[in-house]
Structure formats: C-alpha cells, structure tokens
A protein has these predicted regions:
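Generic structural marker for isolated residues within well-ordered, non-membrane alpha-helices
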Residues: 9, 24, 42
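Phosphopantetheine carrier-protein modules
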Residues: 13-30, 48-60
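Phosphopantetheine-attachment site and its flanking helix in carrier
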Residues: 29-48
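Thiotemplate assembly-line natural product biosynthesis machinery
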Residues: 1-20, 72-76
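C-terminal structural segments of small proteins and small subunits
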Residues: 52-54, 58-74
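Structural motif detector for alpha-helix initiation sites
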Residues: 5, 23-24, 38, 55, ...
C-alpha cells in the first residue's frame, strides 16, 4: 500500500475533528490534542498501515509529516 501525507492527515483530521491540518502542525501544541487523542491517532495509523509504534517513540512523531515519514520508511 502506498502511503501519502494526505492519508495521515485524514486520520488526524478524523481523530481530532479538525478539517484543515498543516503537514507540520504539532498535535499537542497547535492542534489542541490531548495525550489520549495522540494515542488514538497512533493506534489508527498502526491499524491502517499494519505497523507497530512503540510508546517510547510517540514523542518523536509530533506532526503529520513526521508520522508520514515513519510510515513511509517502515513500509519499504
């Protein structure tokens, strides 16, 4: 499955109920997400793209662009 940044932003948008999301908008600081929201985003990404993200890695992926790079790298 080919992943695009739009795929990731769609997941974030659905989880947070926000229509417009920039590639580099930080989930917590700029989009107003709470910790549980971020966990839900991560779980949705894991399920959609069939990969595992360790809890300790979550702070390393605070934006849609960062999550996109992770999914793209692990999908190859």
């Amino acid at each position: 499955m080919t992943v695009t940044i739009e795929d990731i932003k769609r997941i974030v948008s659905l989880q947070l109920g926000i229509r417009e999301i920039g590639d580099d908008d930080r989930f917590l600081e700029e989009l107003g997400a709470e910790s549980l929201d971020v966990m839900n985003i991560i779980v949705a990404v894991e399920e959609k793209f069939n990969l595992q993200i360790k809890d300790s890695e979550i702070p390393d992926y605070p934006t849609s662009a960062a999550l996109f790079k992770l999914v793209k790298d692990r999908s190859q």
